[in-house]
């Protein structure tokens, strides 16, 4: 009984440390986002995070909570969230079976958070690592949109 109570307390203490995709954004799984990006010929924004990532939580609270960032990223990208430690299985548009952890490894997301802007076929365009501020995300969006010929609003 003591063991059950200890596990319950540990779980409740750890919950606030769990980082997830920012609320209010239409984040998809990586495989679904790849399919949608190809169908819409729209670039991807992939957020590599993990449970227990305090820097992910800080970025979520301090940068992704901004309404202008939310509007720009929702408008300009297909959004994907990848838990870089998860064993969740995905099926890529190519038919390849891969876990979220393997996606993280493929895109060198060994620390978190990592934010990777990609072409619709998954080729990296730009990468941000670590805590991001509103200004960082705004400037990255501007640079990616400029590189893509200004498809999204600046």
Name what the model sees in each region:
Residues 62, 106-150:
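Non-catalytic, surface beta->alpha helical segment in thiol-disulfide oxidoreductase systems
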Residues 40-54:
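Short active-site neighborhood of thiol/selenol oxidoreductases, capturing the structured segment around
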Residues 57-72:
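Typically the conserved alpha-helix immediately C-terminal to a functionally engaged Cys/Sec
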Residues 24-27, 69-98:
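Thiol-based oxidoreductase modules, predominantly thioredoxin-like and allied folds used
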Residues 26-44:
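A short beta-strand-turn-helix
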Residues 1-4:
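Positively charged n-region of N-terminal signal peptides that target proteins for export
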Residues 53-57, 115:
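The canonical Cys-X-X-Cys-His
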């Amino acid at each position: 009984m003591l063991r059950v109570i200890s596990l319950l307390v540990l779980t409740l203490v750890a919950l606030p440390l769990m980082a997830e995709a920012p609320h209010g954004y239409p984040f998809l799984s990586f495989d679904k986002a790849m399919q949608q990006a190809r169908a819409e010929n729209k670039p991807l924004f992939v957020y590599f995070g993990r449970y227990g990532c305090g820097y992910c939580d800080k970025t979520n609270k301090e940068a992704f909570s901004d309404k202008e960032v939310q509007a720009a990223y929702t408008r300009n990208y297909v959004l994907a969230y990848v838990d870089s430690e998860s064993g969740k299985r995905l099926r890529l548009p190519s038919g390849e079976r891969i876990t979220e952890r393997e996606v993280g490894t493929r895109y060198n997301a060994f620390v978190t958070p990592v934010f990777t802007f990609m072409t619709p076929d998954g080729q990296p365009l730009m990468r941000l690592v670590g805590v991001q501020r509103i200004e960082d995300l705004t400037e990255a969006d501007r640079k990616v949109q400029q590189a893509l010929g200004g498809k999204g609003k600046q």
